[in-house]
């Protein structure tokens, strides 16, 4: 039977498996024995490994860090690498983010596009390739990681425990045709203490869910006299609400969520809130801190005022996302996610940003750095995937660079390939994340064809 027909026959089982896994809220949680990234992430991994075993594949679970199934008997191995962990659902959904609901030819839920949909499609693509009877000389391993959204500690564990390195492979966690360049990514956490003085005091402030998500909402509580609260509550500004309360003033800011790699597609609610607070009569270190943050970051997405506005011809501008800010009784913690161009280096930006924050009284308390990635267009890996893309889609195109970071940086000989086609609406990390059912099956077919071309 032709490979295309074998993939088509997998559709009902693929949809059922995907719906079941989408109903598991696999956001990183507290570590437990055998579940280093939380109970729900482990449930998601157990579910997909059980599905692989039901299809007749041998599976492996590496201490809850990641798992895989495999087909074939060759000495060399090619890999398809996806992830089951997802970012928090956030607000403003029209559907249950953990429902896996199918409506109007789309399946909705957190992880449909990033990355459960394509990762689970890879399992059924492997089953289709096996059922087709096409001969292969290399083993094919489909891996499911559990920590892609929060540092890729799973891949570090895989390499540290001598996990097998593929001769080539891909992660269906980017865009078509092929992503051969990925910006360097830095997640940094800053903290500081502020005094509480004056008639108007900042009690608390909260905004954002993760460093790699543009925050869609932020709010602040301020203590002040009833008279001052009533006067400030009369203020009006777009996407801001000022409300007088029994303790003083409550300020809410609205934004637009987007993926942290493309912050320019969103509107940062934290930045909007800080720009508003900067106009209020705060005093002391609180005033200084709010002014510094509003002036240095605000709602900018290119790091211009922070002094790190880098650019190159291959991958474009540095991008910066102010992902979280939390203040309680004068204690502040915040996280920034920024991504530098593929021809630049960590040293071109990190020391500059750190220096600005240190000079303003902040302390850097944590940092995660993923180095840039660039695979030449003429490499066997890129040319093979480009050929598959052209043959399967009927479309042309060129390899591209992105700001998003994938497992391609974590495992040698890997690039990102799919699942997003040119012109598709991108809903990853946003409310109402979905994947067109037709695109799900096109991805399954593309993955199966790529597996075969690499393994034959």
Locate predicted features.
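Acidic/His- and Gly-rich active-site-bordering loop/insert found
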Residues: 2-110, 131-136
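Active-site metal-coordination/substrate-binding segment of hydrolases
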Residues: 77-144, 150, 162-167, 430-438, ...
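Acidic, glycine-rich active-site loops and adjacent beta-strand->loop/helix elements
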Residues: 84-86, 140-151, 172-177, 209, ...
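Acidic-glycine-rich active-site phosphate/pyrophosphate-binding loop
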Residues: 87-103, 190-197, 243-253, 358-359, ...
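An extended, acidic, His-containing surface patch that forms the Zn2+-binding/catalytic region
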Residues: 60, 254, 261-329, 339-351, ...
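Midchain, well-structured core segments that form catalytic/ion-binding scaffolds
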Residues: 156-157, 161-341
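Beta-strand segments within the central parallel beta-sheet cores of soluble alpha/beta enzyme folds
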Residues: 137-145, 204, 291-292, 366
């Amino acid at each position: 039977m032709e490979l295309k027909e074998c993939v088509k026959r997998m559709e009902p089982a693929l949809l059922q498996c995907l719906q079941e896994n989408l109903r598991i809220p696999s956001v990183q949680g507290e570590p437990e024995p055998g579940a280093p990234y939380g109970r729900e992430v482990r449930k998601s991994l157990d579910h997909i490994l059980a599905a692989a075993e039901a299809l007749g594949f041998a599976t492996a679970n590496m201490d809850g860090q990641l798992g895989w199934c495999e087909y074939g008997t060759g000495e060399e191995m090619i890999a398809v690498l996806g992830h089951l962990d997802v970012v928090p659902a956030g607000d403003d959904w029209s559907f249950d983010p953990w429902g896996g609901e199918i409506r109007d030819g789309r399946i909705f839920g957190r992880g449909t596009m990033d990355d459960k949909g394509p990762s689970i499609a890879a399992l059924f693509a492997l089953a289709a390739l096996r059922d087709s009877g096409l001969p292969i000389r290399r083993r094919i391993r489909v891996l499911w990681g559990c920590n892609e959204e929060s540092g890729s500690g799973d891949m570090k564990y895989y390499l540290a425990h001598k996990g097998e390195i593929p001769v080539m492979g891909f992660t269906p966690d980017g865009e078509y045709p092929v992503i051969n360049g990925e910006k360097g990514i830095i997640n940094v956490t800053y903290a500081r203490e502020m005094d509480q003085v004056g008639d108007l005091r900042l009690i608390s402030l909260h905004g954002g869910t993760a460093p790699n998500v543009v925050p869609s909402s932020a709010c602040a509580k301020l203590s002040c006299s009833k008279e001052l609260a009533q006067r400030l509550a009369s203020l009006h500004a777009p996407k801001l609400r000022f409300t007088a309360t029994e303790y003083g003033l409550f300020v809410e800011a609205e934004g637009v969520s987007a993926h942290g790699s493309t912050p320019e597609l969103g509107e940062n609610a934290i930045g909007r809130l800080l720009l508003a607070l900067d106009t209020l009569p705060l005093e002391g270190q609180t005033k200084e801190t709010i002014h510094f943050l509003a002036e240095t970051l605000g709602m900018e997405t290119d790091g211009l005022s922070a002094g790190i506005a880098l650019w190159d011809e291959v991958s474009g501008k540095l991008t910066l996302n102010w992902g979280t800010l939390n203040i309680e009784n004068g204690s502040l913690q915040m996280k920034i996610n920024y991504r530098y161009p593929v021809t630049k280096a960590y040293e071109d930006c990190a020391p500059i940003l750190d220096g600005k924050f240190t000079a303003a009284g902040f302390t850097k308390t944590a940092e995660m750095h993923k180095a840039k990635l660039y695979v030449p267009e003429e490499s066997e890996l890129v040319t093979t995937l480009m050929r598959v893309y052209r043959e399967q889609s009927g479309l042309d195109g060129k390899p591209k660079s992105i700001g998003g970071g994938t497992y391609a940086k974590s495992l040698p000989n890997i690039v990102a390939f799919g699942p997003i086609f040119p012109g598709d609406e991108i809903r990853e990390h946003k409310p109402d994340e979905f994947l067109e059912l037709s695109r799900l099956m096109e991805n399954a077919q593309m993955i199966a064809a790529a597996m075969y071309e690499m393994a034959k």
